[in-house]
UniProtKB/Swiss-Prot annotation:
Disulfide bonds: 50-110, 64-121, 82-136, 89-98
Annotated gene: RNASE2
Active-site residues, Swiss-Prot/TrEMBL: 42 (proton acceptor), 153 (proton donor)
Record flagged with keyword ATP-binding: no
Native organism taxonomy: Eukaryota, Metazoa, Chordata, Craniata, Vertebrata
GO molecular function: lyase activity; nucleic acid binding; ribonuclease A activity
One of the record's GO cellular component terms: extracellular space
EC number(s) on file: 4.6.1.18
Pfam families in the cross-refs: RnaseA
PANTHER family reported for this sequence: NON-SECRETORY RIBONUCLEASE, RIBONUCLEASE
Organism: Aotus trivirgatus (Three-striped night monkey)
Name assigned to this protein: Non-secretory ribonuclease
Task performed by this protein: This is a non-secretory ribonuclease. It is a pyrimidine specific nuclease with a slight preference for U. Cytotoxin and helminthotoxin. Possesses a wide variety of biological activities.
Amino-acid positions noted as binding substrate in the UniProt annotation, renumbered to this chain: 65-69
C-alpha cells in the first residue's frame, strides 16, 4: 500500500507542477498589465517577419513561444470589440468575458519551426483575413484611463 500511495503523491506533485508551469506561461511579465502584454503579443499594425516579431515576446518569457497570432490592427480597434456582446470563450468555456469581432482583420500566424533555442527561435508565417475572439476585463490602474475595458487574451481566430 505504501508504494502505491507514494507513487500517487509523486504523480500529483508532477501534475501540479505542470499546471503551475502552464499557468505561468500565460501570465504577463510583472512589469506589464495584462492589456499591455496583450498588445505586445498580438497587436502589430505593420506586419513583420515572424522570427523578428517574436523576439520581443520571447525576450520577456525567456523561451521560444510555440505559436502566436498577430492582429494587424490597432489597440483601439480591439478595445472597440470589447464593447460587442459578451459570449462564452470558445477555447475556455468557464469564461464568459469574450467578444467576437464584427469584421475580419489581416493577421499573421507564427509557428515555431525548428528546435527551440532561446538565442535562435525560427518561425514560419501564414497570413490570413479572419474574425477573432478576445477576452476583455476592466482596466488595470496602469492602463490608459480612456479605456475602461481592455483586451487581455486572444482566445481564437475564426
Amino acid at each position: 500500500m505504501v508504494p502505491k500511495l507514494f507513487t500517487s503523491q509523486i504523480c500529483l506533485l508532477l501534475l501540479l507542477g505542470l499546471l503551475g508551469v502552464e499557468g505561468s506561461l500565460h501570465a504577463a511579465p510583472q512589469k506589464f498589465t495584462r492589456a499591455q502584454w496583450f498588445s505586445i503579443q498580438h497587436i502589430q499594425t505593420t506586419p513583420l517577419r515572424c522570427t523578428n516579431a517574436m523576439r520581443a515576446i520571447n525576450k520577456y518569457q525567456h523561451r521560444c513561444k510555440n505559436q502566436n497570432t498577430f492582429l494587424h490592427t490597432t489597440f483601439a480597434a480591439v478595445v472597440n470589440v470589447c464593447g460587442n456582446t459578451n459570449i462564452t470563450c470558445p477555447r475556455n468555456a468557464s469564461l464568459n468575458n469574450c467578444h467576437h469581432s464584427r469584421v475580419q482583420v489581416p493577421l499573421t500566424y507564427c509557428n515555431l519551426t525548428g528546435p527551440p533555442t532561446i538565442t535562435n527561435c525560427v518561425y514560419s508565417s501564414t497570413q490570413a483575413n479572419m474574425f477573432y475572439v478576445v477576452a476583455c476585463d476592466n482596466r488595470d490602474q496602469r492602463d490608459p484611463p480612456q479605456y475602461p475595458v481592455v483586451p487581455v487574451h486572444l482566445d481564437t481566430t475564426i
